[in-house]
């Protein structure tokens, strides 16, 4: 089972990762092409393109300017420990055991606007470049056109290497749009998380994001291998709903809290 999650806007480069082990991103030559485009943007361009404040635009202009294709523990951090946000709160990577982290290297991938696909221990220099950004580049008008089939090909490689053909999509729509679904050589599973509110079960973004992280953790810590096993997910009050589910879209409900 291979799990795919989104990155996060919030980054933590202040606290050290719990391991010194690292790997290098495999698509970094493509990242370098994007960085060259981004280095040509002024802070005002970035503010407009990304709809961010002048302060965040200035920070990201500085990040683009200082980015280098040489990665080390001095200028980068392992991706799984650098990202912070609702999904990563649920995943709680800092408390994974060394064995679980090793398992994650084969069974977890993070999608990224700048890096394409990241393994948990891949070093990552700080950046902000969301997949939905309409950044014109030498390959097209946005990042979906830039990455083309590269992300799908990398996921197929990882899917083949980890031993079965199940890809669990716990990423957002914005990021999973970068995957060519028809090109995936396996079974795609799209879990859905709904919370009760005013008598109805609804997808509530904040809760759903955290639930995606919780399910990623469940898969890594229990070494889930089948869709049947996935239905046992019960973290934080969620339970499987056979009535609302279809074979490849398992739905998990939670009562109002």
Curated annotation (Swiss-Prot):
Disulfide bonds: none annotated. InterPro entries: YaaA (IPR005583). It comes from the Bacteria. GO terms for cellular component: cytosol. GO terms for biological process: response to hydroperoxide. It holds the Pfam family H2O2_YaaD. NCBIfam families: PRK02101.1-1, PRK02101.1-3. PANTHER family: PEROXIDE STRESS RESISTANCE PROTEIN YAAA (PTHR30283:SF4), PEROXIDE STRESS RESPONSE PROTEIN YAAA (PTHR30283). Belongs to the UPF0246 family. HAMAP family: UPF0246. This is UPF0246 protein Sama_0917. The lineage of its organism: Bacteria, Pseudomonadati, Pseudomonadota, Gammaproteobacteria, Alteromonadales.
